[in-house]
């Protein structure tokens, strides 16, 4: 551990102790997975390379995801498949559902992809990123996922991208058997969701989701984070940086040497 911190001190620009403490607070946690709670999940291709080149690749990936999520009891609330990365909103119903689904899906897809390429190699860049979402951030997270093609300038409206859950959420004629729609249907109508997507995202909303996904910390109210700390028996809220303050002497007697 000392060697790791020493290496971090050497490689981080020396702007002062506060910057170093900020880095430690932003460091990625061991993965936090909470059963029956929504999570945002994302993973990129190795070195941001294209890993989905055509519709055949997209159909193959989504079919593998469907099979694996059913096998490992993972509900899929939303998704967006891009050329070099994927975003998911999922609910794991067992402790291993999320990791097993991604491992199974991405392992099988890597074999499929490498079989089509002149040279085989790593397809996915490291392990996937994820963060738990409370109910108030679930829908903002789903909107962020479905607006990916709009932010990338590929379409003008989310529902125009056929390789995401937006098509099913915005068009009553589209049926997507991969999706768990019960919770969405209780909260939204097609017209209401279209309006919510069209309203767009705030910069703070996007920043918070990206930060929590990168670090693995839950995105939600302080009560939500505290409840997850009780459930997981782990510190999940960011720790305050800097050295702990020395306790102040309450009286002159506190400063006197002890005499037996």
List the model feature ranges, each with a label:
Residues 1-82, 91-260:
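Short Pro-Cys-Gly-centered "Cys-loop" motif that presents a nucleophilic cysteine in a tight turn
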């Amino acid at each position: 551990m000392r060697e790791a911190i020493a290496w971090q001190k050497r490689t981080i620009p020396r702007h002062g102790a506060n910057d170093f403490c900020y880095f430690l607070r932003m460091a990625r946690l061991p993965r936090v997975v909470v059963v029956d709670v929504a999570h945002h999940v994302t993973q990129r291709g190795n070195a941001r390379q294209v890993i989905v080149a055509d519709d055949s690749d997209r159909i193959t990936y989504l079919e593998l995801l469907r099979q694996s999520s059913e096998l490992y009891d993972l509900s899929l609330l939303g998704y967006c498949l891009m050329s070099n990365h994927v975003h998911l909103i999922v609910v794991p119903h067992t402790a291993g559902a999320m990791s097993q689904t991604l491992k199974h899906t991405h392992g099988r897809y890597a074999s499929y992809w490498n079989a089509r390429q002149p040279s085989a190699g790593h397809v996915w860049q490291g392990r996937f990123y994820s963060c738990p979402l409370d109910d108030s951030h679930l829908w903002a997270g789903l909107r962020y996922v479905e607006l990916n093609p709009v932010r990338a300038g590929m379409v003008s409206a989310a529902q125009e991208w056929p390789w995401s859950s937006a098509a099913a959420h915005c068009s009553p004629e589209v049926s997507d058997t991969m999706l768990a729609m019960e919770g969405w249907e209780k909260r939204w109508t097609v017209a209401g969701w279209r309006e919510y997507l069209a309203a767009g995202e705030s910069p703070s909303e996007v920043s918070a989701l990206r930060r929590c996904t990168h670090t693995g910390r839950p995105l939600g109210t302080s009560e939500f984070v505290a409840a997850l700390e009780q459930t997981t028996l782990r510190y999940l809220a960011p720790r305050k940086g800097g050295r702990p303050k020395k306790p102040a002497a309450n009286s002159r007697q506190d400063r006197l040497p002890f005499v037996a």
